[in-house]
């Protein structure tokens, strides 16, 4: 069977929740069993968080950050196929490393005014898609050079000129796309945000 577990702090009876010892750093260390299938949803407020999801059995993921500094790692390959991973960042600094190990069919990102890095290093086993929406922040995409990449933008972006791509209208295609064994299909929507593509050797 399946079970639902909720961890966190919440107010009760319209009151407030306080944490004693405010002069000391408040630290939480949460670990999950690598034997259990996980549909994981996390929300981080004003905190500094490091989350390593490597080696777990992760079937879906939602990460939502507020005014925080968050790093999500896939240090090892996911033990099962992940259908979707969603990342939502407000005025936050978010770094996701090892998305190639996540084995997610689709990744979606929605960003506000923060700085975000999506790193696709890892052991790729299939093609994947990324839907990225960016308001006023900065988004850096780090992609292995062996991966074929297609980027489709909602509108023409004069400032978006990624190295190693050819452009046809609002569509950008990496030079190796036709011969690459693995592919990343990116749909990009941005207004005033800046997007950078960095190749990983």
Language-model features: locations:
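A cross-kingdom signal targeting lumenal/periplasmic-facing segments of multi-pass membrane
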Residues: 9-30, 35-43, 50-52
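Residue-level detector of solvent-exposed, low-hydrophobicity positions
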Residues: 37-39, 60, 179
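Right-handed parallel beta-helix
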Residues: 41-82, 86
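Short, surface-exposed interaction patches in beta-rich subdomains
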Residues: 1-24, 72-201
């Amino acid at each position: 069977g399946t079970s639902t577990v909720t961890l966190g702090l919440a107010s009760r009876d319209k009151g407030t929740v306080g944490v004693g010892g405010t002069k000391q750093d408040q630290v939480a260390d949460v670990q999950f069993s690598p034997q259990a299938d996980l549909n994981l949803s996390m929300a981080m407020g004003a905190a500094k968080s490091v989350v390593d999801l490597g080696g777990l059995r992760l079937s879906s993921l939602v990460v939502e950050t507020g005014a925080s500094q968050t790093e999500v790692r896939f240090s090892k390959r996911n033990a099962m196929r992940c259908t979707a991973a969603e990342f939502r960042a407000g005025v936050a600094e978010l770094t996701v490393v090892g998305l190639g190990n996540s084995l997610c069919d689709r990744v979606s990102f929605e960003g506000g005014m923060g700085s975000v890095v999506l790193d696709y290093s890892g052991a790729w086993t299939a093609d994947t898609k990324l839907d990225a929406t960016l308001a006023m922040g900065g988004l850096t995409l780090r992609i292995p050079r062996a991966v074929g990449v297609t980027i489709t933008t909602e509108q023409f972006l004069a400032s978006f000129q990624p190295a190693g791509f050819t452009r046809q209208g609002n569509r950008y295609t990496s030079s190796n796309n036709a011969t690459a064994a693995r592919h990343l299909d990116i749909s990009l929507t941005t207004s005033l945000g800046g997007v950078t593509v960095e190749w990983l050797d």
